[in-house]
Amino acid sequence: MNAQEANFDGLVGPTHNYAGLSFGNVASLNNEKSAANPKAAAKQGLRKMKQLADLGFAQGVLPPQERPSLRLLRELGFSGKDADVIAKAAKQAPELLAAASSASAMWTANAATVSPSADTSDGRVHFTPANLCSKLHRAIEHEATRRTLSTLFADPTHFAVHEALTGTPALGDEGAANHTRFCAEYGKPGIEFFVYGRAEYRRGPEPKRFPARQTFEASRAVAHRHGLAEEATVYAQQDPDVIDAGVFHNDVISVGNRDTLFTHERAFVNKQAIYDTLTAALDARGARLNVIEVPDAAVSVNDAVTSYLFNSQLLSRADGSQVLVVPQECRENANVAAYLDRLAAGNGPIHDVLVFDLRESMKNGGGPACLRLRVVLNDAERAAVTSNVWINDTLFASLDAWIDRHYRDRLAPEDLADPALLDESRTALDELTQILRVGSLYDFQR
């Protein structure tokens, strides 16, 4: 059956700020306490969505989550009216207010792991929201993520939306940022590739400086609940040294699409064995793996982390050629820019490079790949998505005007204490649910 890969980008929320919450994420730590521009952030992401939609790619949008999270703050012991809760948190524990106010759900690569119907035992598209249990500000996302996915992908004939795995370190799950899929064609059975940072119950190398957020046990559990064939599921360990260099998810050091793996030479432990396993598995599915390995001598791990070369989108055009979507920081790094010029001029599958200004997201450690969740849908499955979430001229104009009406153009850490920010955010989100036709999605609407 004909199928297409859709990208569902997260719309940046009104509380986008730089609180430095993500240990192991170099950009997040380096920009802590800077002033952010939520309006610019949202518009940068929206423009990327629109340009890709204009190029013929299936492009959807996922709404922001409600922030600040009053539920979290009340759970942590702050009481009173909403304004009182925010004031108390700001005075007594500003770091907790920052966690409750994070707009990190914009990075939908961490929202869930998705397996298309061609790969699953029951022939449905399966979603497992990521528990993101390694960081407080992200661990509060999965319930709202499940509600959103269950709203958009509501037909049980076509879709299965699971609950997140239990939020324990042994099952630390960071979603699609550590998962990719290889196939001959999107609608045919493929190979699902899970990358983990450490294993809880068996010995192996681990990073020493920064935490490994994804466990083997979590990856395996997701594969099992999605009903994936064992012979079509491959696991690999990320090199702990690159985690210590700031590669906190695999999508900061490699990206895959269809028959192509674009990766840094230092991405994996026992890389040749991984390449061989992937090659054999994909060969059984009727395709030949094409590995584009970037040598450390051309692009160092530090270059990769600062430019986010691999936190790119690798997209297939209708004619089979591939385009690489990168942040503008790739053009500002001489080594990376030179490599991309050689890549596009070569005879490989990647023929074009598209460059986007995503500066606001990048300063928090999120490039093009972080902002999108890949969902392969056949024609019947796409028709079952009835919400108004597919980017076109009309929706783009509505969302662009909505951002103008509701978003601030400056938000510093101290502004999180402003009780008006909660009211502004709720007003914006209430209107957004009408634009997207997703019903009463948020707690404050119920």
UniProtKB/Swiss-Prot annotation:
Top-level EC class as recorded in UniProt: hydrolase
Any one of the GO BP annotations: arginine catabolic process to glutamate
Keyword Transit peptide: no
Catalytic activity: N(2)-succinyl-L-arginine + 2 H2O + 2 H(+) = N(2)-succinyl-L-ornithine + 2 NH4(+) + CO2
InterPro entries found in the cross-reference section: AstB_sf (IPR037031), SuccinylArg_d-Hdrlase_AstB (IPR007079)
Keyword list, A-Z: Arginine metabolism, Hydrolase
GO molecular function, one term: N-succinylarginine dihydrolase activity
EC numbers, comma separated: 3.5.3.23
Keyword field contains Hydrolase: yes
HAMAP family recorded: AstB
Oligomeric form and interacting partners: Homodimer.
Name recorded for this polypeptide: N-succinylarginine dihydrolase
Native source organism of the sequence: Burkholderia orbicola (strain MC0-3)
